[in-house]
């Protein structure tokens, strides 16, 4: 991200030096790249030369909405409690009636911003769990002071029970300490907080996907790329992320916006990319994903580029 920012800045400087005036240079110097800074993070804004002249804003809007609809999926993939923790903290942040200038509230605000940025309670890069600099007593009092309708309660659950369920995940350093554990000699699946395997050991997961592979297949798919592996009645089974499967409510909305984007695609190549991506979301078939990826790589002419879908495997 930082490298891209530098390149954009250099491009803007070159444009200014070639044909701009001193006034233009002065205006460029006044641009504030920093949005906000907290914890170990700095949020930046940057210029996109030519954006105002772009005629494809409708396409960008549709693609952006498709991405936003998948935000909660990412939170859930990063940890099974992330969404409920985020929603509980957001309820406190927006509805708290106490003093919002206290260190406890201010530190909770920083913690929530880190959760927003990292899509969960673990660091986006180091994957270690955040240490909250506010007290359990403060948060419990704040939660219990809210209308129960504002809280992410399970059916029949009370606010006290919500605190009992989520507080160890937030405050106990021994509970889910790493989103991704890579320590030698440990079960990397059981000891990682990410939500791709539920009650499954590393050996069980490796054996499951090994048995699926066809040694004669010269173009194998990325097994497990778009699914969660769980145990049901003692038997391993995949919950595929697709329309009609896991995350269907969010994926249906993603598909809705992608179909909007499909109708205003820049060219036939880009339209083919979007069409195939929609097909992948609808079928969950990893062969469709491979075909989508090939079409995406081949599209070298579209001015608007985007990535949407289950495309990474290091989370």
Regions found by a protein language model. Give the residues of each.
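Positively charged n-region of N-terminal signal peptides that target proteins for export
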Residues: 1-4
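Sec-dependent N-terminal signal peptides
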Residues: 6-12
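C-terminal motif of bacterial Sec signal peptides marking the signal peptidase cleavage site
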Residues: 14-17
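Bacterial signal peptide processing site
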Residues: 19-21
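N-terminal helix-rich structural modules
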Residues: 28-239, 243-263
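Short, charged, amphipathic alpha-helical segments
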Residues: 271-276
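Active-site-proximal, well-structured secondary-structure segments within enzyme catalytic domains
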Residues: 290-315
């Amino acid at each position: 991200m930082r490298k891209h920012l530098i390149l954009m800045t250099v491009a803007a400087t070159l444009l200014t030096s070639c044909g701009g005036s001193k006034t233009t240079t002065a205006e460029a110097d006044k641009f504030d790249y920093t949005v906000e800074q907290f914890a170990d993070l700095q949020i930046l804004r940057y210029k996109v030369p030519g954006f105002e002249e772009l005629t494809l804003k409708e396409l960008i809007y549709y693609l952006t909405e498709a991405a936003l609809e998948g935000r909660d999926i990412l939170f859930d993939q990063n940890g099974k409690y992330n969404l409920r923790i985020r929603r509980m903290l957001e309820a406190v942040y927006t509805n708290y009636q106490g003093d919002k200038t206290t260190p406890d509230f201010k530190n909770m605000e920083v913690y929530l911003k880190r959760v927003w940025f990292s899509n969960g309670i673990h660091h986006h890069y180091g994957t270690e769990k955040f240490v909250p600099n506010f007290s359990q007593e403060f948060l419990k009092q704040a939660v219990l002071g809210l209308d129960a309708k504002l809280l992410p309660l399970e059916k029949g659950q009370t606010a006290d029970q919500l605190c009992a369920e989520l507080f160890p995940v937030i405050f106990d350093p021994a509970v889910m300490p790493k989103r991704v554990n890579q320590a030698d000699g440990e079960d990397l699946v059981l000891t990682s907080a990410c939500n791709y395997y539920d009650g499954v050991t590393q050996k069980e997961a490796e054996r499951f996907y090994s048995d699926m592979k066809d040694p004669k297949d010269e173009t194998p798919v990325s097994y497990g790329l778009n699914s969660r592996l769980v145990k049901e009645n003692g038997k391993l089974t995949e919950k595929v992320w697709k329309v009609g499967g896991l995350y269907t409510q969010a994926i249906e909305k993603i598909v809705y916006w992608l179909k909007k984007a499909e109708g205003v695609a820049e060219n036939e190549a880009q339209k083919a990319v979007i069409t195939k991506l929609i097909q992948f979301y609808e079928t969950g078939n990893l062969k469709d994903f491979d075909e989508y990826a090939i079409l995406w790589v081949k599209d070298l002419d579209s001015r608007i580029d985007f990535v949407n879908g289950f495309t990474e495997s290091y989370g």
